[in-house]
């Protein structure tokens, strides 16, 4: 990813949060260290929404467990929201979380006996990947930067 934006600006830039190698989607890259801290520190609880493709249908019971909370090795995690993406394909779910713990979405589903086939972050702190082809990037507009600095988005 950093190779794609290598010449975006003269300052040092770095990713805000992380996506593992097998995850696609929204990744904010900045040269503003204060903003990066604000967006990644758990106390600021920035919303992340993922589209998750799983190896089998997710049961209603497991959907409820995820909503209520699941105990993992590093503590409990629960989704702020979870739903099926398509009515006719119960192996695809959308999940909204605020946690920034490493590989949390994958670990959550693996704990319940599922294998994540594909994971795509579709929303982060008010930003989406809408109209942005995979492997491409764009500068934020002034309003988006101001919204992030003011904490206008979860």
Where do the language-model regions lie?
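Basic, flexible Lys/Arg- and Gly-enriched helix-loop patches that mediate nucleic-acid binding at interfaces
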Residues: 1-154
